[in-house]
Amino acid sequence: MDVLTHAPASSSLCAAARSAKLGLSVAQYHTLAFQLPTPIASLISDCLYQYINTTNIMSSSSEAPPSNANEGCVGPQSEDAGKASACAGCPNQSACSSGKFSSPEAVAAQQAEADQIRAALSNVSHALLVLSGKGGVGKSTVACQMAWTLASRGYSVGVLDVDICGPSAARMLGATGQTVHASGTGWTPVYVSPNLAVMSVSFLLPDADAAVVWRGPRKNGMIKQFLTETVWDDDGLDYLIIDTPPGTSDEHISTVQYLQAVGGVSGAVVVTTPEEVSQADVRKELNFCVKTKVRVVGVVENMATFRTKVSSLGFRKPAAARSDSGGDGDGTVDCTEDVIKTLKEKCPEILDLMATADVFPSSGGGPRGMAQQFGVPYLGGLPLDPNLLKSCEDGKCFVETYSDSSAAGPLNALCDKLVKALPVEEEMDAEAINQQLMEE
């Protein structure tokens, strides 16, 4: 795809580039833009996204609404397109009423787009979304450690981070500071092991701390590039795990519409913590899946409890005087060394016991009850395990590095259910599998 050849003539920068006969692919062009000074990069990025969003229909069907359409869109080919009450305030209202989206050129463009996505994902067995209505519940932790666990079992796995403004997959998979290779065929993702690859916008940034301040159309264009221009393993992927931002934003809508255009969504794993504040937002996420017809593979309860060995706990006791608190200002002093020494002498078997505590209050039946309410499987709970957090910080596979840790068993059990729900070897009826998982 020669962006500079097809870019809008209104862009003087693109016009100059065309006159110089620079034939760069979208991937090469975007990678170049990130490396240039901000004013020039902005011009290049504007030019690129003018091209990418020239046709804003994300389906192989001409009936599909544009990605930025209002809820309740009647579709660009409807007789009421641009006139229905749902069209009020939609940025596409005038275009729909003029027939722009239903023109032969638009139909051909959207068909070409769908074909491109289909070709790029033709060797992917399952594309799995990891969703959460609430930020900070450990969605990226679950996504990346599921990827590590599946890869450790020999599956070929890819991780696509579509959290454009807050990417974290690169860090959690140990790929910080890496860059992607851009060629005429597209982007080659970063491989953190022979069968685990990751693609993220963080690989395109000149500085790890650089902010990505983009509006919806630019995010949509970036996601389109990820799906069409990333060259995954030639032998194919068993699982493409797509880590999304919290909520139901442009990234979710665009990703789902792009994938559904080619029948490429296998399902979604929804992550929550036990408290009602999180569940209230996750219920919205589950309703999003219902509206968009995305199968929910199951609900994961993260940070279900805090669980660790007694030997790894710290202990504090009230200070004789506040001035003795060692600078913590809480009126206590550390007594861990004395406690552990006493336990070793008096009752050493206690040190191997697991200490547990509920971190979040659970209400209304908790995540398990919420899953039952929506008729979807409950995949299990992951305890708040310090070693799991350390694995993410270090970019390591948790179940291999800390195989005896408290969350290793639950994480392996979660992946067992995931593989059963989305088998690679043989296709099974999704509804029957969901029913089996709910009964377990």
Label for each model-derived stretch:
Residues 156-158, 162-214, 220, 224-227, ...:
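Phosphate-binding loop that captures ATP/GTP phosphates
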Residues 120-121, 126-164, 286, 292:
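Walker A/P-loop phosphate-binding motif and the immediately C-terminal alpha-helix
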Residues 124, 135, 161, 169, ...:
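Residue-level signature of catalytic and energy-coupling elements of molecular machines
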Residues 57-132, 426:
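Extreme N-terminal, non-catalytic leader segments
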Residues 110, 239-376, 390:
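Conserved catalytic-core segment of NTP-binding enzymes
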Residues 428-440:
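A short, charged, Gly/Pro-tolerant segment at domain boundaries
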Residues 395-404:
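C-terminal boundary of histidine-terminating zinc-finger modules
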